[in-house]
């Protein structure tokens, strides 16, 4: 098994172990507070850190160059994503997108000529004659596991292990319910404290969601946080409760943005006339005799 296949296998194993998390979240009481933390472009951030580079301004992809250009990039640095490159592209898509960007840069460059290259986004911003370049880093799964373990131990400084659920190599759920009183902090303040420790000690930026159950904190992180302006460290923290979820996300589309709603399931829902979470919520209120009811879900 090569390095990329090892990474895919580990991610699959994490997902198998966590299929019950969504079901457990619905039983949480309203006085609970949960936190989800996702490490931003984790593999790419680790590779930048190992090179002494800042992932927020370094253009880097994690991919196995020994394979063809159809190989999937395991990660794209935050800086490179700013140019419109998605998080899990194939390598040839990165190549094509960078070529397109450099054609545009050449059109506005002095004398319509790019005289050098740079993988530093800050240099590219101020020097129009530079061509966009990027680093291709070979996957190192053992190294990523070591960083993930180090970050887990940072969380353990603040939270007991029984209140931390490791969802994947770069994502955790934390029950914060009893810790705000212990530390005298709001959920946002406690989340930021842990995330800043992670950043300073590992060079990895994180995004977080806070909610009254596991589902809401996950959706806050996955959807709401993306629309927030990052702070100076690239961090985003969003919060949802049942009321704000209904207010902000009942009409959100596409459904595939929501946790565990894949394209196949979304298609079946749309075939039934259900296009939003609001549609689904109203459907669940239907009586057995009604055309829309909980059974059809």
Predicted regions, residues:
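Gly/Gly-Pro- and Ser/Thr-rich, intrinsically disordered tail segments characteristic of DNA damage-repair
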Residues: 1-297
């Amino acid at each position: 098994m090569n390095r990329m296949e090892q990474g895919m296998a580990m991610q699959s194993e994490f997902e198998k172990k966590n299929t019950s998390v969504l079901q457990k979240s619905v039983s949480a009481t309203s006085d609970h507070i949960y936190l989800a933390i996702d490490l931003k472009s984790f593999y790419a951030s680790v590779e930048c850190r190992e090179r002494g580079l800042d992932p927020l301004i370094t253009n880097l992809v994690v991919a196995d160059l020994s394979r063809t250009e159809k190989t999937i990039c395991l990660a794209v640095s935050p800086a490179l994503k700013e140019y419109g490159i998605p998080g899990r592209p194939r390598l040839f898509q990165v190549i094509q997108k960078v070529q397109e960007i450099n054609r545009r840069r050449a059109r506005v460059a002095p004398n319509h000529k790019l005289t050098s290259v740079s993988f530093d986004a800050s240099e590219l911003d101020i020097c129009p004659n530079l061509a966009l370049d990027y680093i291709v880093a070979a996957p190192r799964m053992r190294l990523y596991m070591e960083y993930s373990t180090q970050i887990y131990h940072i969380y353990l400084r603040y939270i007991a292990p029984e209140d931390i659920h490791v969802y994947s190599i770069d994502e955790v759920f934390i029950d914060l319910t009893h810790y705000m009183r212990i530390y005298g902090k709001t959920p946002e303040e406690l989340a930021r404290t842990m995330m800043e420790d992670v950043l300073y000690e590992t060079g990895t930026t994180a995004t977080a969601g806070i909610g009254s159950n596991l589902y809401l904190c996950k959706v806050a992180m996955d959807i709401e946080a993306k629309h927030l302006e990052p702070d100076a460290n690239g961090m985003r923290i969003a919060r949802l409760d049942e009321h704000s979820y209904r207010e902000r996300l009942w009409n959100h589309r596409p459904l595939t943005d929501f946790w565990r709603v894949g394209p196949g399931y979304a298609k079946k829902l749309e075939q039934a006339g259900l296009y939003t979470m609001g549609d689904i919520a109203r459907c669940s209120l239907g009586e057995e005799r009604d055309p829309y009811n909980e059974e059809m879900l």
